[in-house]
Regions:
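Proline-centric
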Residues: 287-289, 370, 630-635, 695, ...
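Basic, amphipathic N-terminal segments
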Residues: 424-565, 579, 584-585, 589
Length: 1019
């Protein structure tokens, strides 16, 4: 397995956190209590700032300083005679840091102050928003006000390896020395025999991205995506997108990359065609709608560079390879390392110039990203600037190399901050319902101005504020057109006209925003009371008028909320995906790792999601909605590739998404990482889904791969899965041999749910309701008389947890459940001793909400269990019980009354019927059923964690007992009885031979052939 150097440098990360004044606590980043860190200084200087604002300033300051260190390292690697500028003898305080930020990086050389340090003279003007003051800084929270105080060195500081006697340093000196201790680029001295040797201290842009993601990602549910994932996804999706685009544009029929390369070769020497190919290549639009640290966009950038090299449509003058998501540039067999050339016609200059401008063109034209977190957006911009900085070159004037590095362009405009899932206007919203010729022409002019202004912004070498104002004005105009056509506005105007004609405008109070706005709307649209022969005065308010007014207010509130809801308007935010008439054309490729936020954390967003997404389901996690949003913003035929949780393929909350995907997309491939921990910071099982936006054929083949380790093979051996294997009920990725077997087993049996009542255990909502035998005896001893003792003992029942259940056996753990179920309608005053015990847990057991220190809010009383448990009598019956979070899925027969917590499921006989419990236990514990569980539930493999929800387990088929199979069923039951007896005598008894006999009988029960049995045994 190829070593991935783009992994977290834990020593760097830990010490950086310490210097910044942050620490990790329970998967969160919080401000530490260490004195004289950067956070401590900010908090001391600006004591009214909220913690989020302090962290925002920290990230902003740190991002800039790290960029400066990378810039310095790049300049030194380009010019070995340059001594750098991040020296403590030059940068003596935070005031000088402030000068670097705003008087140097943010100021053209000719406009800089003359009193700046000499070492700053070679620093190029960075034409980017990274060094524009943030709103917090504009409010006076600036770095120059900070005072560098002595900070104790981190216990395992990298600085101690050089001087063990050093114990403290002033913060700024410590910070700079720490950054200087690491390499932020590879210089010629770091390359020996064409191999980089500085991996231990190298902090490349990918590693930085990982650090920034960890600093920034916990709150948003985002996790840094490993390079082996981003590189595979970008290669696969971009290849498909390029082939699709060129086939569509030139009428080609290339089926793969080799076919595309061969087609390009046939046009070598045809400059006119090559120019057209360049334009097509640079018109491919790729978007990450949850961009995070920008890892996918950087990976896409490098892969597009590599593809430009392979297709030979851009002259680069060097050989290019990709490794660990990074570009490797070779010239004449050696690793290419740009240094300041002596002659202006140097080949190295040409290579660096070509790479810089190709990267610039791709970043400006092809890469787009959105994130709800402004810090994430800044980090993404930083990473793209770093990628461009790698190939910055010295300018040429009068055929001579100068000391002036090429200025970096404004590449930040393609990365925007907003809520990707929330838009006020659908993608296909018209700018006008019945546009006139004049409006159509005016709109086309606006779109042209919009595109032109964006290009001027990217090329601008001076103040960008005027262009930004122009862009905001154009977007306001476009948004205004859409708002006029919004259903709420149309409804408001229609109802307002009807209302005023009959009831007049006197009801609108000019002192309120609503009243004033409605009077203005009525005046602007010439809505007046219209006298009639019958009504010469406005009609007094009646029920009809009140209803109209209520609807007007409702529409008004919708329109007002649109002004402040942080919506992101995909409809017009990126002019690159608008045609000349303003129609939304869409992206060629949508790629990413949407945030993983559980549905419990997005309750406040569910109402909006329900209104706007077909895939909505009450329990759906937020990544589900990104699939539909990604589909919306794709062009027809475009490709989407996401890595997400794989639960949607089988979970109940994924049914609407499954329906959507089957109806609206052609699924191209599915890579499952079930049981492989792809993300170090997340335990969720993941998969990569790739689809094309097109109406699918009736049936087609899907490429399927089950990854067993943390890598994707270079040439994956995909299985071909028929589309018919996927249904709304579940995506079952079974092979061609497995699918018929699955269908045969299903058709041979009756779903488990039809054998009896399936219920889960008791959700009490508090540990107070689960007690030990000693506590039970204490409560009973405190009863005042025998009658109370008898009553109380009747509602304290034996209970078990999942850990008490094994295959064919269980062991009660001396625990009891206080069964004060709401369904029993008990009066707690009848149980004084029990009341006294439970009262000791108040208010923790009061139904006042967890946010108020109690249990979940609900209609139950303080002494009752959280769930109603109307089926409490089922616990008293004979039952088959299983623990759905155990990877081996133990099924056990329990005859005695026994209660459970809510992690356990049971099936009992329906009233008036008998449950063949031993038969069910034998079949469900068989090898066949364990194989079936893997196919039909979220089970990973035997022994691994899984959760098989009720909706999946209840579908498992068991053959009904009839005259044809009675003898087989009797043998299974007899073997189960023998196993139970042996386990009763000695729980450690080995019963595998008896279980093997049951396995063979179960295969016969389902009429399986030897080949089918072999398939199950191998699985």
């Amino acid at each position: 397995m190829e070593k991935d150097y783009n992994t977290l440098n834990h020593a760097f990360y830990a010490e950086l956190l310490y210097i910044l004044g942050l620490e990790e606590k329970k998967d969160k980043i919080v401000i530490s209590k260490t004195k004289n860190t950067l956070a401590y200084l900010i908090k001391s200087q600006y004591n009214s700032l909220a913690e989020d604002d302090i962290i925002s300033l920290l990230i902003n300051y740190n991002t800039r300083l790290v960029f400066l260190r990378i810039l310095e390292a790049t300049m030194i690697s380009h010019d070995g005679s340059y001594g750098g500028f991040l020296k403590i003898d030059t940068i003596k305080n935070f005031s000088v840091v402030n000068d670097l930020f705003f008087e140097v990086l943010n100021t053209p050389k000719e406009k800089r102050r003359e009193d700046l340090p000499k070492s700053f003279s070679k620093i190029p003007y960075l034409n980017s928003s990274l060094f524009d003051k943030t709103p917090l800084e504009k409010d006076g929270n600036e770095i120059w006000r900070l005072d560098s105080r002595e900070l104790a060195l981190y216990p395992t500081s990298i600085l101690k390896t050089k001087d063990k006697s050093q114990t403290t340093l002033p913060l700024l000196e410590y910070y700079l020395a720490f950054l200087q201790a690491y390499d932020f680029t590879t210089t010629p001295k770091d390359i020996q025999d064409n191999v980089k040797t500085n991996h231990d201290t190298l902090i490349n842009s990918a590693v930085l991205g990982l650090v920034f993601e960890k600093l920034n990602g916990y709150k948003e549910g985002s996790f840094y995506t490993p390079s082996f994932i981003t590189s595979y996804m970008c290669e696969d999706a971009i290849n498909r997108a390029i082939i699709t685009r060129f086939n569509a544009e030139y009428g080609w029929k290339c089926e793969n990359l080799k076919g595309l390369e061969d087609t390009f070769k046939s046009y070598i020497g045809d400059q006119d065609k090559l120019e057209k190919f360049k334009k097509t290549f640079l018109s491919i639009r790729i978007c990450d709608p949850a961009v995070g640290s920008g890892h996918f966009l950087v990976s896409a950038l490098n892969y597009l560079i590599y593809m430009a090299y392979r297709l030979r449509i851009f002259g680069i003058g060097a050989e290019i390879a990709l490794q660990n998501d990074e570009l490797l540039i070779y010239h004449e067999g050696d690793i290419f390392q740009y240094t300041k050339p002596k002659l202006s016609d140097s080949h190295a200059q040409d290579i660096q110039h070509s790479l810089f401008h190709l990267k610039k063109s791709i970043i400006e034209n092809c890469l787009f990203g959105v994130d709800i977190n402004p810090n994430s957006c800044e980090i993404t911009k930083l990473r793209l600037w770093i990628e461009l900085l790698k190939h910055s070159y010295y300018k040429i004037e009068d055929n001579q190399i100068t000391n002036e590095l090429q200025t970096l362009p404004n590449i930040d405009i393609n990365i925007k901050c907003g809520n990707s899932l929330l838009s006020n206007h659908p993608i296909n919203s018209p700018f006008a319902t019945s546009p006139t010729l004049d409006f159509t022409k005016e709109l086309a002019d606006q779109i042209q101005k919009y595109k032109s202004a964006v290009q001027r912004y990217k090329d601008s070498q001076s103040s960008k504020s005027e262009i930004i104002d122009e862009l905001e004005g154009i977007k306001a105009t476009l948004g205004g057109h859409l708002s006029k056509n919004h259903p709420a506005n149309q409804s408001l105007l229609q109802n307002l006209e009807s209302f005023v004609k009959v009831y007049g405008a006197g009801v609108f109070d000019i002192k309120t925003d609503f009243g004033r706005d409605m009077l203005m709307e009525a005046m602007n649209h010439n809505y007046y009371f219209t006298p009639t022969l019958i009504s010469k005065e406005p009609t007094p308010m009646d029920k009809k008028g009140e209803k109209l007014l209520a609807q007007i207010k409702k529409d008004y509130e919708i329109l007002e909320s649109m002004k402040h809801n942080n919506a992101f308007e995909w409809r017009f935010e990126f002019p690159e995906v608008l045609d000349d008439d303003g129609n939304f054309t869409g992206f060629d490729c949508v790629i990413g790792n949407p945030p993983y936020i559980r549905q419990e954390a997005i309750k406040d967003k569910k109402s909006n999601l329900q209104k706007n997404y077909q895939v909505h389901e009450g329990k759906a996690d937020i990544y589900v909605y990104f699939y539909e949003r990604g589909h919306q913003i794709l062009r027809d035929g475009g490709l989407l590739s996401y890595i997400t949780s794989n639960k949607y393929t089988r979970a109940g909350y994924g049914k609407n998404l499954r329906t959507f995907l089957l109806k609206n997309t052609q699924i191209l491939s599915y890579i499952d990482f079930n049981g492989v921990k792809v993300f170090d910071s997340a335990s969720v099982d993941t998969s990569i889904m790739t689809f094309a936006k097109r109406i699918p054929q009736e049936d087609y083949a899907i490429d399927y791969l089950a990854c067993q380790e943390k890598q994707i093979p270079k040439n994956p051996n995909f299985l071909s899965i028929p589309r018919s294997a996927l249904s709304n009920e579940a995506f079952t990725f079974a092979s061609g041999d497995e699918l018929p077997l699955l269908e045969k087993i299903k058709s041979a049996g009756t779903p488990l749910k039809e054998w009896g009542d399936i219920k889960y255990g008791v959700k009490a909502g508090s540990k107070a309701f689960i007690i030990s035998t000693a506590k039970r005896e204490e409560i009973l001893a405190n009863c005042k008389d025998e009658e109370e003792r008898e009553r109380t003992s009747q509602i304290i029942k034996k209970m078990m947890r999942g850990a008490n259940i094994k295959r064919y056996q269980y062991a009660w753990g001396e625990e009891w459940l206080i069964c004060t179920f709401p369904a029993l309608k008990l009066d707690i005053e009848d149980y004084p001793a029990l009341k006294a015990y439970l009262e000791s847990f108040r208010p923790r057991i009061d139904p006042i909400g967890t946010e108020n220190g109690g249990r979940k809010k609900g209609g139950y009383k303080w002494f009752e269990t959280q769930d109603n448990i109307a089926y409490h009598k089922n616990f008293e019956k004979e039952k088959v019980v299983w623990n759905p979070v155990n990877g081996v899925y133990y099924f056990v027969h329990i005859k005695e009354p026994m209660y459970f917590n809510n992690s356990i499921f049971m099936i009992t006989a329906k009233d008036g019927t008998k449950l063949p419990a031993l038969y069910i236990v034998g079949v469900m514990n068989s090898r066949l059923q364990r194989w079936l569980l893997v196919q039909m539930t979220n089970l990973i493999k035997e022994g691994d964690y899984a959760y098989g929800g009720k909706d999946k387990i209840e579908q498992l088929p068991i053959p009904k007992i009839d005259s044809a199979n009675q003898s087989i069923a009797d043998k299974i039951i007899a073997l189960v009885e023998e196993i139970l007896e042996k386990k009763k005598q000695d729980s450690a008894t080995d019963t595998t031979k008896l279980e093997s006999q049951i396995n063979a009988l179960v295969y016969t029960l389902y009429n399986l052939t030897d080949e089918e049995i072999e398939l199950i045994e191998k699985g």
